[in-house]
Amino acid sequence: MNQSVSAAPVVSAGSVTFGQDRPLSIIAGPCQMESRAHALEVAGALKEIAARLNIGLVFKTSFDKANRTSASGARGLGLKQALPVFAEIGSSLGLPVLTDVHEAAQCTEVAQAVDVLQIPAFLCRQTDLLLAAAATGKVVNVKKGQFLAPWDMANVVAKITGGGNPNVLVTERGASFGYNTLVSDMRSLPILARTTGAPVIFDATHSVQQPGGNGTSSGGEREFVPVLARAAVAVGVAGVFIETHPDPDHAPSDGPNMVPLREFEALVRRLMAFDALAKAADPALPK
């Protein structure tokens, strides 16, 4: 287990910066793009919240949920319909945009409309996909597979940087623990930073997912999102990934682990307070 790499750099997605010693930034949005109107509604609300809190925010949503538990699960708007919406969110709202890619052939086209290409956890070792994403020059956010140790991600990141792209983020989203269960080992956060040399993101919503736990869909325990998010920020991360939705109980995917949009601002405000304390050079002792 090699843990000797250079200090984590700062990676910028548009105007939003991610760094282990920089103020916390957020990646947030609904699980999948349900419609143009829905995406713009949520993105607009998140932009207003980010402005009030003075925090960097990257908007995320998926054009295709290609790994749904069941073939009957809704997958999203689709690539061709989603691309102009991604571009519109970036141009009209000024938010950097993140979406995931599943095939190497998608990367060039998607990169024309977004700022960050995300590699899903299940695909994090697919070399051709990683190299295609790297070749776009966009920021690449690669999620740690639920089946990998944190130090295994050094080889994953090396594929991207070896492809000539230093702009890499690494996301922790839990580790498989028995059937239909994930656990979050907070030790993985500093290990990821140390072994990959990349800014580390904590995915607070997928970490409480129960994969396949509802038979034809995944379950989740959204009540633990704030708990794990606070723990991760206290340990020290560059950013937190939070899926949010105006009505998660009726969302087409990942509803059980998404944060209701009405609760998002209070959660992020609390995380910012934890982040300020965790990154303070000399925290004042309580009087």
Curated annotation (Swiss-Prot):
Catalytically driven reaction(s): D-arabinose 5-phosphate + phosphoenolpyruvate + H2O = 3-deoxy-alpha-D-manno-2-octulosonate-8-phosphate + phosphate
GO biological process, any: keto-3-deoxy-D-manno-octulosonic acid biosynthetic process
GO cellular component: cytoplasm
Keywords: Cytoplasm, Lipopolysaccharide biosynthesis, Transferase
Documented EC number(s): 2.5.1.55
Disulfide bridges in this chain: none
Main location: cytoplasm
Class of the enzyme per the UniProt entry, highest EC level: transferase
InterPro entries per UniProt: Aldolase_TIM (IPR013785), DAHP1/KDSA (IPR006218), KDO8P_synthase (IPR006269)
Pathway membership, UniProt: Carbohydrate biosynthesis; 3-deoxy-D-manno-octulosonate biosynthesis; 3-deoxy-D-manno-octulosonate from D-ribulose 5-phosphate: step 2/3; Bacterial outer membrane biogenesis; lipopolysaccharide biosynthesis
Highest taxon of source: Bacteria
One Gene Ontology MF term: 3-deoxy-8-phosphooctulonate synthase activity
Places the protein is found: Cytoplasm
SUPFAM superfamilies xref list: Aldolase
Database matches in Pfam families: DAHP_synth_1
Record-stated family: Belongs to the KdsA family.
Name assigned to this protein: 2-dehydro-3-deoxyphosphooctonate aldolase
Organism listed in the record: Nitrobacter hamburgensis (strain DSM 10229 / NCIMB 13809 / X14)
